[in-house]
């Protein structure tokens, strides 16, 4: 048998297999691989980026779904509404474009894309939350500059379920600054609503709101 590495450590293995083909030739195959043994499991977070826009009449479905998920799972559901409208951040939209086929859309942990309705989000959340988490990230302190500055200083630490120094892997932090309840005087801030007057059934209160 193969001995597993110590908990939290990694080990390299070389496996060689020899067999004889139909022409009686001896064939030797060698595989080199590494194995990590996870030492402990950290609490997993589910990050959902929602592609949305005020021009999108079906996007209230995503607004309702994201709100419901945050209320139900406040500690491990991280929802980020990524707007492609007057509130657009070009760099962010460009970053998620490879995942987007249409709006509204939910991108789950940058691996799965799906409709952001409440039942669909909940179903995918249940699949994601049981996956093992190999690291824990903690923000100790965040300092924002003055109103004219774009600088943010963040003190962050992380722990790994394996020896990250020996693993020779390239890990990076990604931070997202969000702003809630953004309002403006332009009509471009008004949400288009195809669920007005009950069209499409109940939608978290949007069925009672105007169409724009």
Where are these regions (language model features)?
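Exposed beta-strand face motif in extracellular beta-rich ectodomains
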Residues: 9-15, 152, 171
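Surface-exposed coil/turn segments at beta-strand junctions on protein surfaces, enriched
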Residues: 6-10, 41, 147-149
